[in-house]
């Protein structure tokens, strides 16, 4: 049922336990600085207790100038300032939703929510000026509370469109969750290789092409961007995650079949529940899933269906995808449920409230879509472990 895929990058869990030999720390002396400066910095880089995790690789990610050699960059200072605010036990939270309905089936150990976002406090994690909407904040401790309620041990954090190619909020979310987190970044043709190196060490395992939020449905654009990104990530064993329409899926089907990297389609591959199983492009998506070349996230059901709270019309789509190849399906909440459609009369720079979605009830639909616990274990545990290298 499964086609050949590039092997995932193996991960030594000690990497995330912060021993003195942590590759993130070693990267500071090996890659981030010219050799003429290693002697003045390598001891600090390898011994400082805050040189670890995603924050520990930021020197590699952003680099230094000679003038900044013996001081924190502004970016690092912001991150370390954010550490106190975001990991110091804040008493007040933002308005991100929490589950109202208890989970009504047994969640297997090491289950993974494969689609989430972090929206940091704007003064510490500024938004991209070209964004199409502005969300409320949604912080790592809120996400942790969500996952305790859902019995999710692992998480994948995806850089949302509002940050452009700035992946700092995602890296910080990974840092907050440690060994149980992976990330999906957004890059472009100008992103330096050293940034990709740093993000790989921090736990990033793929890059996202988001065509849907910008309303881009031209398959020609999808083909061009897909080719460019596949060339960037193929040597790393990463994958390409796409948020797009079924029209684009059909338009790039041949590229996906021949792709040197795995491909993941977000949110039911762009299928719309109201249009049913015969909608244009859905057969192409099923074909790619059967081939083993493509994963699909049965995530954010409310983006495919308007029939809240159970999204009953999404069930045939989910069941068809699972039946096509259960080894290529993963699940996600899409927490904190940003409303990417700015209301009429509101500027994209004005804050649009997060959607209030009951993720407990949403997760309970997985047992409706997949009755067999063994299939649910594949979707929640085994497939994410393979795809993201847990």
Residue ranges, per PLM feature:
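Short, intrinsically disordered low-complexity segments enriched in Ser/Thr with adjacent Pro
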Residues: 2-9, 15, 36, 40-42, ...
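N-terminal secretory signal peptides
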Residues: 9, 31, 49-72
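N-terminal secretory signal peptides and thylakoid transit peptides that target proteins
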Residues: 69-84
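H/E-rich (His + Asp/Glu) clusters that bind or coordinate divalent metals
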Residues: 94-102, 278-390
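Hydrophobic faces of well-ordered beta-strands that scaffold small-molecule active sites
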Residues: 112-116, 155-157, 183-185, 207-209, ...
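Alpha-helical scaffold segments that flank or form the walls of functional sites
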Residues: 129-177
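Active-site gating/metal-coordination segments in enzymes
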Residues: 162-247, 254-257, 290, 295-309, ...
